Amino acid sequence: MKKPIPLLLLVVVAAGFSFAADPPKQPVPYSHKQHLAMGLPCKNCHTSPDPGEMMGIPPVKVCMGCHTSVKTESPHIQKLAKHAADKTEPPWVRIYQIPSYVFFSHKVHLETGAKCEGCHGPVAAREALWKETNISMGACMECHRQNKASNDCTYCHEARQ
């Protein structure tokens, strides 16, 4: 009798590829690859009113900062322009969610030399993004251990000034 291990291994690997994270369908496609290839730094779009604490999905007015004159004939840009005119935001699908009981500062991480790719994967190579990294307490603590950052509970679970 042949051993079923090679066949089983093939099935497991194939299943892994079929369950690989697909990018969520966004209301307007956005290519990080295309925008970063033009030399635009992440902070051009990913800003926040409170510098650096929580960056997130840029408001449509940020997109329109360029797209009032760039690719205006694109149906996708026209969709963004409609949202801007209506003062509404597209119903973006958030990829990463940080629980409200966790204090997380992009600013602190970037100031210590962390790169966006460390958590978000090779953004510059992606047409669309998907959840590439398990954002969990264990993953954060492991990164803190590797980078000699504090793993004291209050470091992330109490707002710091």
Regions found by a protein language model. Give the residues of each.
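Boundary at the C-terminal end of the N-terminal hydrophobic targeting segment
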Residues: F17-D22
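Sequence context surrounding c-type heme c attachment/ligation sites in exported
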Residues: P24-Q78, V102-Q161
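Short, surface-exposed beta-strand/loop segments
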Residues: H76-K87
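Bacterial N-terminal signal peptides
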Residues: L8-A15
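Positively charged n-region of N-terminal signal peptides that target proteins for export
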Residues: M1-P4
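Alpha-helix-centered segments that form part of catalytic cores
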Residues: A85-L110
